[in-house]
Amino acid sequence: MKTGALTTFLALCLPVTVFATTLRLSNEVDLLVLDGKKVSSSLLRGAESIELENGPHQLVFRVEKTIRLSGNEERLYISPPLVISFDTQLISQVNFQLPRLENEREASHFNAAPRLALLDGDAMPIPVKLDILAITSTAKVVDYEIETERYNKSAKRASLPQFATMMADDSTLLSDVSELDTVPPQSQTLTEQRLKYWFRLADPQTRHHFLQWAEKQPPS
């Protein structure tokens, strides 16, 4: 897609619906899947928040933080993938609250029994269900979207069955009229559909930065 066409395409992605919940992102949280859809890391890189509709949501993510080792050394701690489900029906803002993770002992405890909180805009805890996403694939590159679908079909603690089949058929991605102004034509690629979805969820500043980046890209 040529840069000019990409910019025009993205400009048409601005939401026509009003989102009611702001999910504040943390630089210590690597968001992998949102509501059954793989997160577009390139679009959300550096974003401070994304906008969600009211209702049930599910995040798959990893906690990534530098921890101290003995002898004043440090290493990057990466948690196992976690699944958290919650409802934003009456909530306007969601914030991550991570436990203390400063050393190997605290990291080991977190691996064995993860715990964290989601807080609303008044710093009040939001009811959540938290679980570890057990990976069944032996591939070098994990498809977290597929693993999340499998998890949601297994009636686990944080499963949300309504997100289990959303990605089973890529041709249905974003075909609901509540997510698109019009149903995408058959010629529209899956990549474009995914890009449109994540562009609409990104906060205005992230959209602006992405459009600036797109304008600088050479035509393909």
UniProtKB/Swiss-Prot annotation:
Statement: the UniProt record of this protein carries the keyword Signal: yes
Domain of life from the UniProt record: Bacteria
Residues making up the signal peptide according to the UniProt record: 1-20
Keywords: Signal
Disulphide bond pairs: none
Protein name: UPF0319 protein YccT
Lineage: Bacteria, Pseudomonadati, Pseudomonadota, Gammaproteobacteria, Enterobacterales
Family: Belongs to the UPF0319 family.
Species per Swiss-Prot/TrEMBL record: Salmonella dublin (strain CT_02021853)
